[in-house]
């Protein structure tokens, strides 16, 4: 590919680095997701580091070899990983084309593999109780218990809960929390009392309280550093709790599934669950719940009777 340099100087490695950071800055502004930007940054640095080429010299086979190649884990990439790699590199090249820096995208000839999503699952109320029963009464355990209850009671996503700060909570006639969700969507909702009580217990155990914490203080600080824990820290602990409770391993999103299913089981309508989850449409929620609950077969008895294996 030939380089059609616009206002950025790509004649040096430093110039290309500035272009990369310009792309990441735009990506963060558009997606409002630091996690997405960090993921793109890691993948792009890995790709260009392995290829040893500047963006204007990259060819389709370079992208293919990297996307389908073994990563740092030493394992063959899944279809989801391959798709994410291709999407990342392609997005960067679309940016370069829009900026009139290059004229073509080396990802265009490549087809993304079909990813078969795993069936979502949620924990039952009894399973969540089993899980909470194995969480220790230590300061870390009380913190993790508060996180679990906040996830289950609010149905918010992992990053939305982990990023909560003292200033995210407001005490009025009830306790409310503000959040920034997917796509930059913001909201203010009641924080159910079980989550409030768990948070207060955890903060009291660690010598903190909402009344004296600074607005920017994380609700989930590391006991040693005082800095906010990462979602990876919580996930590591969660895996241990699930194993101790005799439950199947799963990610943090398991609690969003659980929250949706428990609300539905409690009698909420699809419309109410959709609003609870901040879904973009009822169709999204209907599909979400159908995959969680399974679809009832109301005609199997008639079919069985027709073939003579069940008496009517």
What are these regions (language model features)?
Residues 1-312:
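Conserved catalytic core of the tyrosine transesterase superfamily
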């Amino acid at each position: 590919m030939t380089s059609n340099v616009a206002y950025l100087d790509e004649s040096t490695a430093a110039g290309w680095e500035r272009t990369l950071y310009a792309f990441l800055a735009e990506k963060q502004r558009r997606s409002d997701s630091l996690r997405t930007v960090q993921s793109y940054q890691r993948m792009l640095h890995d790709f260009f580091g392995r290829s040893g080429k500047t963006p204007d010299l990259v060819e389709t086979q370079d992208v293919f070899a990297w996307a389908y190649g073994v990563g740092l884990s030493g394992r063959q990439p899944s279809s989801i990983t391959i798709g994410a790699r291709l999407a990342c590199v392609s997005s960067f090249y679309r940016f370069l084309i829009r900026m009139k820096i290059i004229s073509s995208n080396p990802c265009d000839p490549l087809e993304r593999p079909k990813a078969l999503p795993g069936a979502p699952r949620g924990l039952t109320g009894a399973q969540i109780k089993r899980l909470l029963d194995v969480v220790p009464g230590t300061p870390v355990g009380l913190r993790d218990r508060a996180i679990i209850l906040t996830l289950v009671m609010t149905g918010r996503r992992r990053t939305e809960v982990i990023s909560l700060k003292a200033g995210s909570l407001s005490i009025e006639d009830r306790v409310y929390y503000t959040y920034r969700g997917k796509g930059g969507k913001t909201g203010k909702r009641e924080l159910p009392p079980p989550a409030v009580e768990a948070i207060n217990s955890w903060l009291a155990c660690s010598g903190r309280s909402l009344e004296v914490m600074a607005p920017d203080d994380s609700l989930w600080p590391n006991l040693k550093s005082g800095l906010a824990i990462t979602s990876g820290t919580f996930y590591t602990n969660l895996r241990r709790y699930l194993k101790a409770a005799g439950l199947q391993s799963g990610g943090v999103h398991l609690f969003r599934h659980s929250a949706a299913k428990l609300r539905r089981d409690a009698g909420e309508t699809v419309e109410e669950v959709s609003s609870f989850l901040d879904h973009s449409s009822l169709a999204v929620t209907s599909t979400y719940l159908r995959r969680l609950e399974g679809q009832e077969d109301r005609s199997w008895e008639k079919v069985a009777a027709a073939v003579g294996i069940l008496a009517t």
